[in-house]
Amino acid sequence: MSDMVERTLTALPGLFLQNQLGGPAASRAPFFSRLGGLIRGVTALSSKHEEEKLIQQELSSLKATVSAPTTTLKTMKECMVRLIYCEMLGYDASFGYIHAIKLAQQGNLLEKRVGYLAVSLFLHESHELLLLLVNTVVKDLQSTNLVEVCMALTVVSQIFPREMIPAVLPLIEDKLQHSKEIIRRKAVLALYKFYLIAPNQVQHIHTKFRKALCDRDVGVMAASLHIYLRMIKENASGYKDLTESFVTILKQVVGGKLPVEFSYHSVPAPWLQIQLLRILGLLGKDDERTSELMYDVLDESLRRAELNHNVTYAILFECVHTIYSIYPKSELLEKAAKCIGKFVLSPKINLKYLGLKALTYVIQQDPSLALQHQITIIECLDHPDPIIKRETLELLYRITNAQNVVVIVQKMLEYLHQSKEEHIIISLVGRIAELAEKYAPDNVWFIQTMNAVFSVGGDVMHPDILSNFLRLLAEGFDDETEDQQLRLYAVQSYLTLLDMENTFYPQRFLQVMSWVLGEYSYLLDKESPEEVITRLYKLLMSDSISSETKAWLFAAVTKLTPQAHSSPLVEKLIQEFTVSLNTCLRQHAFELKHLHENTELMKSLLQGAQNCEDIVADASLSFLDGFVAEGLSQGAAPYKPHHQRQEEQLSQEKVLNFEPYGLSFSSSGFTGRQSPAGISLGSDISGNSAETGLKETSSLKMEGIKKLWGKEGYLPKKESGTGDKPEASHVPAEGATVENVDQATTRKDQAQGHIPSTEEKEKQLLASSLFVGLGPENTVDLLGKADVVSHKFRRKSKLKVAQSDKTPSAPTAPCSALSLGSDVAGGDEDGLSAVDRGDGELSSELFRSESLSGPPSAEKLESVSLPVPSLFADNNMEVFNPPSSSATSTVKEETPECRHSGLVEICSNEAVSVSSYKVWRDDCLLVIWAVTSKTDSEFTDAQLEIFPVENFKIIEQPECSSPVIETERTKSFQYSVQMESPCIEGTLSGFIKYQMMDTHSVQLEFSMNLPLLDFIRPLKISTEDFGKLWLSFANDVKQTIKISEPGVALTSVLTELQQNLRLRVIDVIGNEGLLACKLLPSTPCVLHCRVHADAVALWFRSSSSVLSDYLSCHCQKVMQTS
């Protein structure tokens, strides 16, 4: 009895404890309570140090638990959740990565789910442990359990790298036919991820994408839109046939035909609508026929998107964007304009911002919209929200012209002084510098504006702004007197700034000052060089000046030393800095000391800017040709450009192989550099093309935008015969009465006898200054700049072309004549013909040409205006509008007959002679072999056979063989040759096989070279198309070629290029020429040519690096041998 009681009393505490912990669930409680306790403990801490101590203790405990061999999968799952929480806090839990993969491999559904979740959070695409997950994913993709398949598809679309795609791609393709819509949708999203990282590997399943677009489930269809939006952005023309499908889908969405679960606050599938609108905007761009298919659905979208929720505002914004992107329709434009007006006039800040953003976009096509909302835009300039003010400045930037540049730049500077955010300062400083260089009214305003830019922008602004400003001062403009006045005012302004006491200037501004004072102080009459050196010496002695800036200052002092005539400050400067701890400054001091001791050497080296001639750098390093030739003869490897080496490196990289017998798969091709978009120089002679291609900017893009508005109003509307819009009154001058400022309001006020207040008058005066030049007589172009602008700072032409003396009373222009010659007489010529002079006479030197069918006809070259050149534009080469007196070039048309080479014997024997010649057709190279019998005997079964050649496609033409070649008769064999992939040269080889009467057959072998030049053809495009191609190409090559005869005319240079390289002259503007060609079948290349005093600067851009390198090399040979 006593034993029984004792046992009962002993067991009671355990029973009470079990009930307290929750009975049977008590075994799970410690793990969940630990996670909850960890979260509560972290949130209760008051310092980062305490948090780190707690997490490290937890990680140590977890490491011991997961490493223990007795740990169950259930315990591992709960530990993995705590590891995820630790990683989310930023602490390293890498010891658990391998256990997460094991958990995904071995657990049940819940444990596998936690394992996959941990893997997707722990690992990235390039992590080496991902290789261990491939077999698990493949096994789960083949599983019959839907949850396992979904988990595998999810992790594939999240973290799978491009090297592992071939292992799972066939399985994911099969899932596109799965009966469950969730599997099909996740498979489409996985393929979308593959398309983003390796588009070449999914090219063969584009037809399955179309099936997904027509899937019966809305979720699968919506997932496929992600892929199509991406593909249409890259190549809209290839998917025009799907326009009706997208329109039909949008009609069903707008009409509410989708299930209710796709609606958001009673708005049917808003994000699906937005994607479809973006797709339609890309498909209908510059395509009237395609745009007509979507007019009705866009009208319906505008009508049904009632302003009752924020998401409908996004739909309306996309509708407006699409309407102004496609081929325009007047009714839709009017409705879109009303929608923009509702946004702009809305009291809600978000809607006002959306309206300004839409107005900023559409202002490029319809500048009259800005005239309708002038007062609202003026009010937005003083809006308390900084984002509204910044977007308003962006809008004003788009409509800047020579008449309103002063007021707009002033507003930008006011905002710049108030802003503290670095990225805003960088963006605004670049735009102000661009506008100042393009539309500066005078020298004083330009220098003062740039001083403000350097002062406010400081050391955070783009370094190219500094170098471009100095280059502009150094190169000058067309007027030498104006150049000197600009430089003199710059020197005077900088001396005035340096004389101000207790004023701090940014380091880059001081660098600009030092360079200008060192170069152009000789222009001063009242200030001596010693006084300038004194000011520079004070800066050198300041402790707040950086070592880099001191180097600039030292260089300026060195330039001024020959003019200072043994200034004691120079000797004092040498003594102080020859013992400096800074290596660079000490080197400068010793150089100055050496020059100071040798007066003759100093005078010969430091002649001053007034005695210096223009220096043209030889970027091609032609003076090293002998050294290169010697190295190549001794077996040295030829130089390969960086992009070519990178392509070879990518092609040789090993990839993971998931098949036992080496299943091949196409790897993603090398993607070239992005098109240049940096704040950069125009037509640089010795610039680095690699650096140019890597810069970035916020400059405006004009690529692909069609001009819909001109001086006569809305161009497509007038062409269609509809009525014209009423013209807004043009504001003649600043301060005049504005007749088009909120006209409806003004008329209403006048009817009611309203007298404008002082504040309203000030707004109207400001509007007259900001929106001057936006009337129909002076509209803005696609970039928001005036159509006709008197460019203040135009680069100086280094070479003056001789003017004709035949008509001294009329303005003359240089005549140019170019010819594209053939290798033999009879080739057609493509050259510059006579130009139309002011007196109506034609005068030029025409090149003689012999044609196979007669002289070619001449055709006037269409002159297409481009924006004015800018040092700060997003493109390194821009062509400015020529003056009205400039010459208009004409180009000869191709002759009807194809050009061909001469007949050349390539092999022969005692019985047969084989000759060949090339015919350069527009679509291919035609090689014709002529087989001629030398004897009286007849021979039979004559056949010509060509061996296959890598990179070339050879097609036998009709009548290519002859059963019998009669005595003394010649028979021709024709083969068309096409280059499939660009290469420098190929060798075409084969044999002619024939049999004489009553004798054995004879085989005669031959070979011939096929250089790349055989596949280059002139490309006939407009100047506008030239600009678009220039912006779209990634591979560019620059080189400067010295010419033997200084002062050569541009026409002579273009003639040589046309005759020898089959280029076509697109336009000639001043001392610059635009040329274009294409590598068959369709690889274009554009060339910008500029003639200097004793050199020619050439700049090639093409989608093929081989083509641009080849043309660059051969241009140098042509120019040096001419």
UniProtKB/Swiss-Prot annotation:
Residues 714-728, 745-760 have a biased composition (Basic and acidic residues). Keywords: Golgi apparatus, Membrane, Phosphoprotein, Protein transport, Transport. One of its GO terms (cellular component) is trans-Golgi network. The modification Phosphoserine is found at S699, S851. Residues 841-853 have a biased composition (Low complexity). Pfam families: Adaptin_N, AP4E_app_platf. It is found in: Golgi apparatus, trans-Golgi network membrane. This is AP-4 complex subunit epsilon-1. The lineage of its organism: Eukaryota, Metazoa, Chordata, Craniata, Vertebrata.
